[in-house]
């Protein structure tokens, strides 16, 4: 794992800057703590990473988050046996509508990035398909106990694409720790970032009554549950969460809709808005868009964890 030097320890108790969301505007926000350059050893030798930086600004009708894609928390180590790539810095802009609009029907995220955190690191939850075949109907759930060990995730539930992009597959633990909300309930709802369709993303706490800011904060649980019985064809075996298709949505469970979100008030949108929730169980990161995602959020690059299936999962049978 790569850490800042003790003499310049990470100071990331909260994202620095000001969010001015009441008028659909965001003032400049800085997410660059005083990290020294960090050494990430690649297959080709050592590379020094610059200090992490992320800036958000309002350019009507868009919000733009520009990042150098360097995590602002401890990460790695990379490469590792399940993920043979190194984190690489490059400037990238993520663009979302400042006034998001719901589409006529939810849209599966497919192999697109779902969104971006305020520290400039993308959310990209999709995993490889069984036998590397997208037509198989079975997609590995990267966060599952049987798939995760072979995909090289670090303790922030993240790993690296072949082009060096560090991205989260589950709750961004390093970011949550730096905000002081990884374990203890927060005092108010915590905005973590934005989905590619522009709707905000919050951590797993929300008001008991969605439209009442005076109601207490409670943990918001997903409505997804494991299917009963065994898989029909494909990898066989019981529905144990190894595959995305092992889950089904049950509207009687939890407080969230199939998009892992709900409409309600938040500290940043006191009049209410649809917002996604990152939960601590499936789907962790939502898998459906409410609105139209912007094209600045890319699809997967083939490599371990995508449909370059890691060797240990290539012939998987339950």
Predicted regions and their residues:
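N-terminal secretory signal peptides
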Residues: 1-9, 20-23
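Bacterial Sec-dependent signal peptides at the C-terminal "C-region" and cleavage site
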Residues: 25-34
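Solvent-exposed N-terminal domain segments of exported/luminal and surface proteins
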Residues: 34-147
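A short, polar beta-strand/turn micro-motif
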Residues: 65-111, 170-210, 288-292, 301, ...
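Short linear interaction motifs
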Residues: 74-78, 144-155, 251-259
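Extracellular-facing segments of soluble proteins and assemblies that are Gly/Ser/Thr-biased and enriched
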Residues: 109-189, 193-195, 199
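Extended, compositionally biased non-globular segments
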Residues: 197-199, 204, 208-304
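Terminal regions of secretory-pathway proteins
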Residues: 306-318
